[in-house]
Amino acid sequence: MSKKPTVLMILDGYGLNEKTEGNAIALAKKPVLDKLMKDYPFVKGNASGMAVGLPEGQMGNSEVGHLNMGAGRIVYQELTRITKEIQDGDFFENTQLIKAVENCKKNNTALHLFGLLSDGGVHSHITHLYGLLELAKRHGLENVYVHAFLDGRDTAPTSGKSFMEALEAKMAELGVGRIASVTGRYYVMDRDNRWDRVEKAYAALVDGEGVEAANAVEAVAASYAEGVNDEFVLPTVVVKDGKAIAPIKANDSIIFFNFRPDRAREITRAFCTDDFDGFVRKSGRLPLTYVCFSEYDVTIPNKSVAFEKVSITNTFGEYLAEHGKTQARIAETEKYAHVTFFFNGGVEAPNEGEDRILVNSPKVATYDLQPEMSANAVADKLVEAITSLKYDVIIVNFANPDMVGHTGISDAAIKAVEAVDACVGRAYDALLSVDGQMFICADHGNAEQLVDYTNGEPFTAHTTNPVPFILINYDDSYTLREGGCLADIIPTLIEMMKMEQPKEMTGKSLLIKK
């Protein structure tokens, strides 16, 4: 039998930083947490970048942190998932991408690659286009054309020219691909049914009509000279001997490498819908092999999807319910959605046997005015839940280090950490009184850096710092391994509870024999 209850305590925004300047966690008097880190197994865990499914070097956040924890696996966003598949090589075996390539081989037709030429990472990423060019090269395709949509919103307003030059260099290096047209996202990525804009983009792509230029870099330079930046570049076709070099024709293949749906739908409708009524298509719907990077809209026909959405099944909450275990989720308002909706993989409804205990956050303009927030009331509910012995598992979040950390006010953040430390002490005493077990962690850093080390200004964002993992009152013959991440926490709890990890969870338990 395992000990009961098993408590997962999340100290929101409690990161670990070796510098003490602007570090509310180092500057706070926190006798309880200091003692627990000394007396019990303690390691640093990774809560940012690829370790939580975000781009390398990107700070973690509460939504992503709780999603990864509850899932017991790294949950990759589309951006990182596709990037990772390119790195791992799975990308080059993707069934739908291969289908587009094979169609070109069979019909001796062109492969058109279009999407937002940008490293903004919001709608697309230029490295994904490079992956597609590599795919075309591996298959020996010769008629490969890029239709570049220029950004200037998620990137600098005139960065398009440098992206274009980088793309030209990559195509020269690979020996495959030519830029056939250039269009500002204003025209081709509308999302408000402004079909007059989309029509201009479509005319350039299919009919070879629009502003004419000898090459893409020249087209962009000319647009800048007119005072028109990336977002608003008029649909422009690259011409040779007065004719567009590569209008899209029947039986061609298109791969649209935007992964965010909202601004990819309209142009996709224009290509794929049989009874399209946004504007008149001169040739009607062209028969094409049209592949979208993600599912833009299930109602759009005549297309396929390269990267289907991954649903998160068998989260920790589901798993506990399936095994007849009881669970409590406790948080104040600010973090209530995180310990419920996000922890459950984006599912709103509670699981069987899951009690949700909400404590109202204080009604103040900013939390530096009340840095203790509602931590004491959360601790009251937590102590009550522990000592009731009603629950097999209790998941609790203390919001203070994050919410007060966001104000950038050091004195308040120090008080916030001290308030939480006292609450941890109360929970620890209650836990020992019933011989329960606990794992303390954080979802990302924040309160440990309240100053920008480059310029001395207040720093109010999350960080990429590691977070604490502390194992409380489990089994003295075990310790924790280094190098873990948030996805490893639930597999650890499952082992602590002497249960079997489900196959959907790919995180690895942090427990190791001493």
UniProtKB/Swiss-Prot annotation:
Keyword Transferase part of the UniProt annotation: no
InterPro entries, per the entry: Alkaline_phosphatase_core_sf, BPG-indep_PGM_N, Metalloenzyme, PGAM_B_sf, Pgm_bpd_ind
Record's protein name: 2,3-bisphosphoglycerate-independent phosphoglycerate mutase
Free-text remark on how the cofactor is bound: Binds 2 manganese ions per subunit.
Enzyme class, spelled out: isomerase
Gene name as annotated: gpmI
Source organism (scientific name): Lachnoclostridium phytofermentans (strain ATCC 700394 / DSM 18823 / ISDg)
Role noted for this protein: Catalyzes the interconversion of 2-phosphoglycerate and 3-phosphoglycerate.
Enzyme Commission code: 5.4.2.12
